[in-house]
């Protein structure tokens, strides 16, 4: 076709070498964001379950779940390049690895959100922490200051699974979902998470 040809309904378009040139090494995202092939491979390799409704990945550490002013690439960026219908159901901190649910459409995202709100999904986190809490199993009620400088009441169950050489493996079961809840609770226990530069 010539450069001044106007595309009409039912026209067939053929873009030469489209997949080879566009998708061989990267995928284009809105605002000119490019997702390197290596990161796409990481995402595909992280999938541990998938059906027609949702995906479960084992999110690797050091990638953000959502974008932000200082975030170049996030899981949200990646899934939006795969399909604009994909939706995050919950989030994990950038430094945290673990299971992350991705709904394949808005309706399924709402279903999962309701399951989380109704406490029908149990969240369990494992962390290596410094020291050894006085109580090896307990429930912590703690007020945490949020971004609006208001107090949020949090509730967290924890259990020490193993201790060795001044390090404890602790399982946390947060009953509320506040920002940095587990990190703040572990610090309050006197056993901050190893490698947590913000709360250690």
Predicted regions and their residues:
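RNA pseudouridine synthases
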Residues: 1-200
């Amino acid at each position: 076709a010539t450069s001044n040809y106007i595309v009409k309904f039912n026209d067939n378009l053929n873009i030469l070498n489209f997949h080879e040139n566009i998708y061989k090494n990267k995928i284009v995202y809105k605002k000119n964001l490019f997702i390197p092939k290596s990161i796409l491979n990481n995402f595909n390799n992280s999938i541990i379950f998938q059906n027609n409704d949702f995906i479960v990945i084992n999110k690797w550490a050091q990638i953000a779940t959502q974008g932000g002013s200082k975030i170049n690439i996030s899981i949200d960026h990646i899934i939006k390049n795969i399909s604009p219908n994909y939706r995050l159901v919950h989030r994990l901190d950038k430094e945290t690895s673990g299971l992350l649910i991705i709904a394949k459409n808005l309706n399924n995202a709402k279903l999962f959100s309701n399951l989380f709100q109704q406490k029908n999904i149990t969240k369990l986190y494992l962390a290596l922490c410094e020291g050894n809490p006085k109580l090896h199993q307990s429930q912590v009620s703690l007020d945490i200051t949020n971004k609006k400088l208001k107090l949020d009441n949090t509730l967290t169950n924890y259990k020490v699974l193993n201790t060795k050489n001044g390090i404890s493996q602790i399982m946390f079961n947060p009953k509320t979902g506040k920002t940095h809840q587990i990190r703040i609770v572990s610090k309050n226990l006197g056993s901050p998470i190893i490698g947590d530069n913000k709360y250690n």
